[in-house]
UniProtKB/Swiss-Prot annotation:
Photosystem II (PSII) is a light-driven water:plastoquinone oxidoreductase that uses light energy to abstract electrons from H(2)O, generating O(2) and a proton gradient subsequently used for ATP formation. It consists of a core antenna complex that captures photons, and an electron transfer chain that converts photonic excitation into a charge separation. The D1/D2 (PsbA/PsbD) reaction center heterodimer binds P680, the primary electron donor of PSII as well as several subsequent electron acceptors. GO terms for molecular function: chlorophyll binding; electron transporter, transferring electrons within the cyclic electron transport pathway of photosynthesis activity; iron ion binding; oxidoreductase activity, acting on diphenols and related substances as donors, oxygen as acceptor; oxygen evolving activity. It comes from the Eukaryota. A quinone binds at H215, S264, F265. NCBIfam families: psbA. Chlorophyll a PD1 binds at H198. The gene is psbA. It comes from Anthoceros angustus (Hornwort). This is Photosystem II protein D1.
Length: 353
């Protein structure tokens, strides 16, 4: 026994570091994924805050027309953003040392690439850390699987879409108005609202919100009261208690009578799997949709209008969408293009008579 203790005490500094990193007794679990996650997320967060406050305007379109995004250059919380890296840089890796000066790096939107690449690495490591902690505690791995949905969505808009379009300047700006601008331009160029994978994502997000509200309200309404009427029902719960805290039979009976019997789960495990799977699968599909539209496999288009026997156009909702898309397309990057791509791709009429 004494020999064992002596060996433990003489363990190397590296061994003690490994034990500390992988210990589940720490207040916050670090883990090997955390060793990479902590510096990358700290870097992304620090640069984001500094750039959001003080970054100079960025030549996003590569046409020597810088766009301001920071608070000190005239923006507020709503209009401010980290402007994406310039189209002049394209998909090139653009760290600070690749620029002739820090001023040039800022002018070409270097902070955007720095933030996005560190952020994506950081959230991927956060997902790995979730799996790692689950593994150490003997839990099942589905927490990390669920988190893969928002990781996939972030990767789609910040990395896959710029790769497909050929430039980080097409990535989503890091700000409120910038996000909306990205959505509007995406609709104009890819007709995302008519893409079935986006529709599945909408069903996932809105359906998940509905199911979450239904589940929470049902459980809260069917608590087993352990207190008097003069006390909060919450006071009757003890953390770690063996007894059920709510009556699933009562909740099942209520919901089964509200709609019909088979609309209500009578198995708690099936119910919670459904609550997790519905929004996760929906967001997976949306990320997949963004990733395919990145390479211009777009949503349904109805460019051929419905016509009557005389050749007259019968206007439909599709015609209104097409007109709206063209309007949005001509408004964005208005100094970089003379015509939207849809109009410019049509063969020019003959001028020789």
């Amino acid at each position: 026994m004494t020999a064992t203790l002596e060996r433990r005490e003489s363990a190397s500094l590296w061994g003690r570091f490994c034990d500390w990193v992988t210990s589940t007794e720490n207040r916050l679990y670090i883990g090997w994924f955390g060793v990479l996650m902590i510096p990358t997320l700290l870097t992304a967060t620090s640069v984001f805050i500094i750039a959001f406050i003080a970054a100079p305007p960025v030549d996003i379109d590569g046409i020597r027309e810088p766009v301001s995004g920071s608070l000190l250059y005239g923006n507020n919380i709503i209009s401010g953003a980290i402007i994406p890296t310039s189209a002049a840089i394209g998909l090139h890796f653009y760290p600070i040392w690749e620029a002739a000066s820090v001023d040039e790096w800022l002018y070409n939107g270097g902070p955007y690439e720095l933030i996005v690449l560190h952020f994506l690495l950081g959230v991927a490591c956060y997902m790995g850390r979730e799996w790692e902690l689950s593994f150490r505690l003997g839990m099942r791995p589905w927490i990390a699987v669920a988190y893969s949905a928002p990781v996939a969505a972030a990767t789609a808009v910040f990395l896959i879409y710029p790769i497909g379009q050929g430039s980080f300047s097409d990535g989503m700006p890091l700000g409120i108005s910038g996000t909306f601008n990205f959505m509007i331009v995406f609709q104009a160029e890819h007709n995302i609202l008519m893409h079935p994978f986006h529709m599945l994502g909408v069903a996932g997000v809105f359906g998940g919100s509905l199911f979450s509200a239904m589940h929470g309200s049902l459980v809260t309404s069917s608590l087993i009261r352990e207190t008097t009427e003069n006390e909060s029902a919450n006071a009757g719960y003890k953390f770690g208690q063996e007894e059920e805290t709510y009556n699933i039979v009562a909740a099942h009976g209520y919901f089964g009578r509200l709609i019909f019997q088979y609309a209500s789960f009578n198995n708690s495990r099936s119910l919670h799997f459904f609550l997790a799977a519905w929004p996760v699968i929906g967001i997976w599909f949306t990320a997949l949709g963004i990733s395919t539209m990145a390479f211009n496999l777009n949503g349904f288009n109805f460019n051929q209008s419905v016509v009557d026997s005389q050749g007259r156009v019968i206007n439909t909702w599709a015609d209104i969408i097409n007109r709206a898309n063209l309007g949005m397309e001509v408004m964005h990057e208005r100094n970089a293009h003379n015509f939207p791509l849809d109009l410019a791709s049509v063969e020019a009429p003959s001028v020789n008579g």
